[in-house]
From Swiss-Prot:
Family membership: Belongs to the transglycosylase family. IsaA subfamily.
EC number: 3.2.-.-
Protein name (record): Probable transglycosylase IsaA
Function: Is able to cleave peptidoglycan.
Expression induction or repression: Increased expression in vivo during human sepsis. Highly expressed under biofilm conditions after 8 hours of growth. Positively regulated by SarA and the two-component system YycFG. Also positively regulated by the two-component sensor-regulator SrrAB under aerated conditions. More protein is secreted in a secG or double secG/secY2 mutant (at protein level).
Subcellular location: Secreted
GO cellular component: extracellular region
Stretch forming the signal peptide: 1-29
InterPro entries attached to this UniProt entry: Lysozyme-like_dom_sf, Transglycosylase_SLT_dom_1
Length: 233
């Protein structure tokens, strides 16, 4: 079911006060009373909250840099979007457009392989669908062509995650794509009764796997601790 999202606000939680943005005005953190640390935490660990509501009522256009990332939060008073971008240009974010399905990506811009999710209802699982050109969860390279003998692939989401893992670990994207294909067949919500979950089928001890970001972070932790041996290599 497509949803038209009205601007219920996160302002109380974030402490955003005393700001009304005009069209085209870009506000840095110094221009508004913004809890930057909380916004950063939401962007990395609680994306569902940012997806569900704008950070304040009314229009705003807020940008700031913290710990090597550029963070962007915008709204026209009805629809809103957010994203964060590392120094190397790799981005992760969410665009919420009234009357449209949710779309997310790891990178934005043209000529980019991207991934989006089609939320059928507020309680439904998400599935990969064709990508938009707006803020999206993808990498700047095309999807991997890895396909296992049993037909498993990393899928679009998994291929994007494999590219990011390659950047963060130095292990080739094709290796990570093969791991994802074998472990989860590219299914973000894959779950094993043993407790392993996500694209990489990491155990709970490596961290939560509610979002793609969290799954990548958990896989990086597992790799740093055990190398590819964590996946039997």
């Amino acid at each position: 079911m497509k949803k038209t999202i009205m601007a219920s606000s996160l302002a109380v939680a974030l402490g955003v006060t005393g700001y009304a943005a005009g069209t085209g005005h870009q506000a840095h953190a110094a221009e508004v009373n913004v809890d930057q640390a909380h916004l950063v935490d939401l962007a990395h660990n609680h994306q569902d909250q940012l997806n569900a509501a704008p950070i304040k009522d009314g229009a705003y256009d807020i940008h700031f840099v913290k710990d090597g990332f550029q963070y962007n939060f915008t709204s026209n008073g009805t629809t809103w979007s957010w994203s964060y971008e590392a120094a190397n240009g790799q981005t992760a974010g969410f665009s919420n457009v009234a009357g449209a399905d949710y779309t997310t990506s790891y990178n934005q811009g043209s000529n980019v392989q991207s991934v989006s999710y089609n939320a059928q209802s507020s309680n439904s699982n998400v599935e990969a669908v064709s990508a938009p050109t707006y803020h999206n969860y993808s990498t700047s390279t095309t999807s991997s062509s890895v396909r296992l003998s049993n037909g498993n692939t990393a899928g679009a989401t998994g291929s994007s995650a494999a590219q990011i893992m390659a950047q963060r670990t130095g292990v080739s994207a094709s290796t990570w794509a093969a791991i994802i294909a074998r472990e989860s067949n590219g299914q973000v919500n894959a779950y094993n009764p043993s407790g392993a979950s996500g694209l990489f089928q990491t155990m709970p001890g490596w961290g939560p796997t509610n979002t793609v970001d969290q799954q990548i972070n958990a896989a990086v932790k597992a790799y740093k601790a055990q190398g590819l041996g964590a996946w039997g290599f």
